[in-house]
């Protein structure tokens, strides 16, 4: 099965598998079973075996999976050898936290440029990332395919349009707005308020006892 035909649910779990396998490799572990994987990443073992089956024979029955082989496979599949440069739009509290964190555990992802409208932030360097004025977006945004939005909701659509116009094809949207973009642009929405409300609702109405 071609990689672009892999179910999206499977594709979303691949970074989770990679992180755990990478940790095992750093610990010097040579092999791992689907049961061990299941307990660590909180995905049932049948789902893990099905996910892995899309890529052919990654393990052997009765032996499990070779950690070094799996690590090499996931590095290649997730393009860990290629650096993806990311732009951050909005250097407020959340944006600043992203700049300081800057995906240190992800070898292939780096925020390399940030934009904001606040003159007090423009021209500064936060976490090693230069901050430019939002009006410079078109001039400064070169060869960047991914952007993170941490701006007020009422600005999200206009900024998203500018990002698309200047070549961005993937947006991680932390604003409450559901931005409108062309069909060939991929947007992942993360609304922390909704996630928290959902958690509280499930705690009240779906007991795990």
UniProtKB/Swiss-Prot annotation:
Cell location: Cytoplasm
Gene Ontology MF annotations: DNA binding; DNA-binding transcription factor activity
Record keywords, A-Z: Cytoplasm, DNA-binding, NAD, Repressor, Transcription, Transcription regulation
Oligomeric form and interacting partners: Homodimer.
Organism annotation: Oceanobacillus iheyensis (strain DSM 14371 / CIP 107618 / JCM 11309 / KCTC 3954 / HTE831)
DNA-binding region: 16-55
Name of this chain's protein: Redox-sensing transcriptional repressor Rex
Gene from which this protein is expressed: rex
Annotated Gene Ontology cellular component terms: cytoplasm
Gene3D superfamilies the record matches: NAD(P)-binding Rossmann-like Domain, Winged helix-like DNA-binding domain superfamily/Winged helix DNA-binding domain
Superkingdom to which the source organism belongs: Bacteria
